[in-house]
Amino acid sequence: MDSVVFEDVAVNFTQEEWALLGPSQKKLYRDVMQETFVNLASIGENWEEKNIEDHKNQGRKLRSHMVERLCERKEGSQFGETISQTPNPKPNKKTFTRVKPYECSVCGKDYMCHSSLNRHMRSHTEHRSYEYHKYGEKSYECKECGKRFSFRSSFRIHERTHTGEKPYKCKQCGKAFSWPSSFQIHERTHTGEKPYECKECGKAFIYHTTFRGHMRMHTGEKPYKCKECGKTFSHPSSFRNHERTHSGEKPYECKQCGKAFRYYQTFQIHERTHTGEKPYQCKQCGKALSCPTSFRSHERIHTGEKPYKCKKCGKAFSFPSSFRKHERIHTGEKPYDCKECGKAFISLPSYRRHMIMHTGNGPYKCKECGKAFDCPSSFQIHERTHTGEKPYECKQCGKAFSCSSSFRMHERTHTGEKPHECKQCGKAFSCSSSVRIHERTHTGEKPYECKQCGKAFSCSSSFRMHERIHTGEKPYECKQCGKAFSFSSSFRMHERTHTGEKPYECKQCGKAFSCSSSFRMHERTHTGEKPYECKQCGKAFSCSSSIRIHERTHTGEKPYECKQCGKAFSCSSSVRMHERTHTGVKPYECKQCDKAFSCSRSFRIHERTHTGEKPYACQQCGKAFKCSRSFRIHERVHSGE
């Protein structure tokens, strides 16, 4: 007959169950365990042959060590393998429900008290004395997988992972469990009991592990660190799940369809698509859901809870998906890119709606070009691109617009309204997209990267325009002369060469400009402002295009390549001038003598031979020059350089 050990008859609790016991219940547990130990120790000793008092002293020391070891393990350790049949303690009840903790090691029969076990033991012919296991010894080995256990109770429960035995069945829903602790925790999903309450925020939890993980949100503790990428986690399950992103492991396979999953929770939810099980039922409206996250999100419809708060603007959301979508308004992130036209979108529904235009599967189809729309308002706005209708007219200047949003933005140019303010520098903007793009000048964020050359952009429109450098696409064509342009701004400026329109007038000197950027640059000649500073050498520029061209002197970047000979240039104007050496085009013609030039700068210098203008004057001797190059050469006469 196998020996009977103290661990075989001890009543064990999980760490969660032990935490629920009150001080009086813990004291009762210690007293019962000590009495059990005395009774068990008396089986294998001949009291008549030894000094009784010595034995009592020895037994007292040993039982104290054993009971303290059990209690310490419950108070301090991370419980792993010791899970056995236990009472279901409630925090406010002082009763202690007894189970049958005394099991015969020969035949497995259970008894309520030790004396009954003693009487039963005599029915077996062989009898061995009590044997004390050394601390840490694991004498129970699983024949299936070789795993070893210190306690018979843990070993029996482990065997169920192989046999599939689930002796604990829920009366409410019929679900069965291998472990009593799992069964007790499951019962709480029906009763709604949440015994673990956070003292910081009052939130309550069904599971102790979830409660511990939640507490780390307040403390900021993240004890689990990934060796691969250094990412830290507050919860061990999150850490284990993360490790699988590196290993690619998907240990949970569906027996129905063969699909494998990285996470057990995802696997469980997937299984319900086959079984139709929906264990999470709303008490308010009776709706049942298969997924706990969907259930929690649904509950918020009734409670109005909005736990996801935006740090930028304070707006709160009930659902994490809505919150993530909102965050993109601030960051400008548009993860859904159309491969057809390059347009990017914040949300998947917006992207899908846009794709209908290309596929032609929408209910509202344009008869002119075949583009389709799922929204009637979008369809109406699109039709105006063909009809030329512009129903929204500005009362201030008479300018008309096909779209109400464009009209509202235009009105702000007259009212001066700038409702969108940068929190970093206080600069205000009339348009929300403009403030998002501006904020990136502070953060340095450039989310749009060119796959051709690796260049990154803070603004999606700049990115799309840049792509046309590689593709050569020029979608904007002038109806007057047939000239095509890559950029709408260039096209609009070109149109003004035909109309002669110069809407931007300088208040200082009255000079007018056809282009807003030229106007802003001109204003800086009066103010002396040079807002663009090179981080490499500190040189400052009044124009953003000038600093970009200058930066290329440091980086060596030459993005503009001649298609004829392959020569590359840092500046777009340089490549255009160079291309004229191949084509022979000389667009700048002198009205005085009919001489033509390929370069505007050469043309301006030539004009000075007729006008006599010499804008470069030497401060040393007063001599003047019509060309900056001649002026610099002259200066060396004085400097001796």
From Swiss-Prot:
Subcellular location: Nucleus
PROSITE patterns given in the database record: KRAB, ZINC_FINGER_C2H2_1, ZINC_FINGER_C2H2_2
Domain KRAB: from-to ranges: 4-75
Main location: nucleus
Membrane spanning stretches: none
Family: Belongs to the krueppel C2H2-type zinc-finger protein family.
Protein name from the UniProt record: Zinc finger protein 709
Organism: Homo sapiens
